[in-house]
Amino acid sequence: MLSITIEALTSEGGDDIHLHAGGQGVWVARMAAELGASPVLCGFIGGESGAVLRPLLEQMEVELRLVETAEGSGAYVHDRRSGERVPIAQSASMPPSRHEIDELFSTTVAAALDSGVLALCGPYPGEALPLEIYGNLVADVKANGTPVVVDLSRPRLDSALEGGPDLVKINDWELAGYIEGPVDTEQRMRAAVQKLIDAGAGAVIITRAEEPAMVVRGEEAWELVPPRFERGSREGCGDSMMGGLAACMAAGLEWEETLRTSAAAGAANFLRAGLGSGSRAVIEDLARKVELRPL
């Protein structure tokens, strides 16, 4: 989607207006590319906002496999002049046609098999893709031996779980929905994670805002503890972690190195204003400081 940001140019007044390609898929792909992967971005594009968005996407080190849609691409405007991100406007999203959905589905499956991993992310808010698309994507990609990592909210996540993803990234408040109560103890968190595993997840990473992420795979569990920073923004940190996971899985790295790198990618994003951004050199330095604490 097209992101329009208003920032203060100087303390004396005046505004600075930025146009960026945005959306979870864009931020994940950007971080994966920074870490040396060759991501392929699949999605819809169209309308006036799409005409502005395409050249911004083409500036990224990402292969584009975009499906033209009769409806416009999503766009939103937010104001950062106060130092906080304040939403001003967001365009409505119209449902794509059956033909457009079919084209995106087949394009995504082919790209995943070519790339070696599928990172399945949330759509533009309000985008009405049929729920079964998510489970079908996971199942078809997995059937060909390609790993899948997902970062989705319910009910899309429930559909994806039916396909058996290798790894699910979820935050603690969304995880709480699986046991209808807060995941405020390790016991309750493990109970909620078990629901995801029983539904099809191979492993689960739970992000917990300022608390260390928790990782569960099989009978093993860890806290994932990156360096702690006091001032920064958590916006985009989860997407940077997702990009790190996808890049490391595509490269076939060992599990612990994958976890350390993805946690470092999220920590690096915390220090920056740009979503899904970070320096590979900084991430590699921070990864050496990440602790994996067995639970």
What is the predicted role of each segment?
Residues 79-117:
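Conserved phosphate-binding/catalytic loop of the ribokinase/pfkB sugar-kinase fold
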Residues 132-219:
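Conserved phosphate/ATP/ADP-binding segment of small-molecule kinases
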Residues 158, 186-295:
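Conserved phosphate-binding/catalytic region of the ribokinase-like
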